[in-house]
């Protein structure tokens, strides 16, 4: 990963991004003594999600099915699936549900969680993935933990990872993830 770190300027409250001509002001949140992140929340932003889905769908033509994790990836994967005319997409849940039959489980520790979480898919979804080209979709990739867990689920279900896409990469660039923009991490000079 190639890191993208900007110096934090005392008193700075926002970071502005522009993706596909749409500008958004993101609040800077302190996450440690010397580190701030620009908080990105796309839930409810139909205009932004629709525009990003248009661009990301171009990268996923040729996939048979898409997978994401709950919950912020759901509106994005829904829009992309609509554009690609996919009849179904898979959502990995963040905990086992009583209705799941023979669930597949992969553990990860996203940057927004204090403890490891389990990403799970119902075993009844395996036929939708097995022997298929699967596009992995996320709104933002920070530590790559969630994306890696989704990859594991695809492989466990017998699918092939087609491509991995995200609206934003945070703090660095991963060569195997296609994206629309980068969010830097902000560090205070010591």
Question: Would you name each region that the model predicts?
Answer:
Residues 87-134:
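Short, glycine/charge-rich flexible loops or terminal/linker lids adjacent to PRPP-binding catalytic cores
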Residues 85-87, 159:
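A short helix->loop->beta-strand "cap" motif at the edges of active sites that frequently abuts
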Residues 63-70:
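Short glycine-rich phosphate-binding loop at a beta-alpha junction
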Residues 70-76, 142-143:
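Gly/Ser/Thr-rich loops at beta-strand to alpha-helix junctions
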Residues 64, 132, 162:
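Conserved acidic residues
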Residues 75-84, 151:
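Short Gly/Thr/Asp-enriched flexible loops that form oxyanion-binding sites at enzyme active sites
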Residues 2-10, 148-190:
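PRPP-dependent phosphoribosyltransferase catalytic core
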Residues 1-62:
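Active-site-facing substrate-recognition patch
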């Amino acid at each position: 990963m190639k890191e993208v770190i900007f110096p934090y300027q005392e008193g700075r409250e926002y970071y502005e991004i522009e993706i596909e001509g749409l500008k958004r002001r993101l609040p800077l949140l302190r996450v440690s003594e010397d580190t701030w992140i620009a908080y990105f929340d796309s839930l409810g932003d139909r205009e932004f999600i629709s525009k990003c889905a248009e661009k990301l769908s171009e990268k996923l033509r040729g996939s048979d099915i898409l997978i994401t994790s709950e919950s912020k990836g759901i509106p994005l994967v829904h829009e992309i699936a609509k554009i690609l005319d996919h009849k179904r997409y898979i959502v990995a849940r963040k905990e086992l549900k009583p209705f799941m039959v023979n669930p597949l489980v992969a553990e990860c520790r996203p940057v927004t969680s204090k403890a490891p979480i389990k990403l799970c898919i119902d075993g009844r979804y395996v036929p939708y993935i097995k022997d298929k080209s699967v596009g992995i979709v996320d709104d933002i990739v920070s530590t790559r933990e969630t994306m890696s867990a989704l990859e594991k689920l695809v492989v466990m279900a017998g699918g092939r990872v087609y491509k991995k896409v995200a609206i934003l990469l945070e703090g660095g660039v991963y060569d195997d993830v296609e994206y629309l923009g980068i969010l830097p991490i902000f560090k205070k000079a010591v």
